[in-house]
A protein has these predicted regions:
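Nucleotidyltransferase catalytic core that binds NTPs
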Residues: 1-207
Length: 207
């Protein structure tokens, strides 16, 4: 079995997240993509909706697609030192010992991978599917760092097919300042946000 692991804030989940997961699933012939929302305890994230709110939005959005599987592995962690991508991949590997795991990441974070906590171990141990982002050249990034060069065969690229990006921070700001981003997110996510008055604030931090 071939499994992609797609971690993100999903704050909120957008159609871009779903398009990305499904594009990788199709182009790399994966059996499923496990979608992992980040825990609010993570120090490298500035999250706005709670763990449970983001879990509900994700679960509602993928309920009709068995190949997109939400996971609570990070949300249920109580120890901050376990909230690292390498630890998540280790856990999923133990849960799926016969599967080939692929870490899904955007091209914009590729250059930072060696600087992540346990980033070296992550790069050495797993295969990566890098999703194209406008303005980022994967070949140049890989050649620019000795660790990435040494494991360049661990990285493959997926083109999403379009350059436009709709960030979660843009969605949050639309809600906060009276906009109506209903056509940028799934209906179930839009309705959940409205029902629970999420992101209804004056000033928001960007991701």
């Amino acid at each position: 079995m071939r499994i992609g692991v797609y971690g993100s804030s999903f704050d909120p989940l957008t159609y871009i997240h779903l398009w990305t997961a499904n594009s990788v699933l199709q182009h790399k012939h994966l059996d499923k993509v496990i979608m992992v929302p980040a825990n609010t305890k993570r120090q490298d994230k500035s999250l706005h909706a709670s763990n449970e709110q983001r879990w509900e939005m994700l679960s509602l959005a993928v309920a009709d697609n068995p190949k997109l599987e939400p996971s609570r592995i990070e949300l249920d962690q109580t120890q901050r030192d376990l909230l690292y991508s390498y630890k998540t991949m280790e856990y999923l590997h133990r849960e799926n010992p016969d599967a080939e795991l692929f870490f899904i990441a955007g091209a914009d974070i590729l250059a930072e991978l060696p600087n992540w906590t346990l980033g070296k171990q992550l790069i050495e141990a797993y295969q990566f599917i890098i999703v194209s982002r406008d303005g980022y050249d994967m070949g140049k990034i890989l050649s620019g760092h000795p660790l990435l060069r040494a494991y360049d065969d661990h990285f493959s690229l997926v083109y999403k097919g379009f350059a436009n990006e709709v960030s979660s921070s843009y969605i949050r700001e639309e809600f906060a300042y009276g906009g109506d981003p209903r056509y940028l997110i799934p209906d179930v996510v839009y309705n959940y946000i409205q029902q629970h008055n999420i992101y209804q604030r004056g000033v928001l931090n960007h991701e």
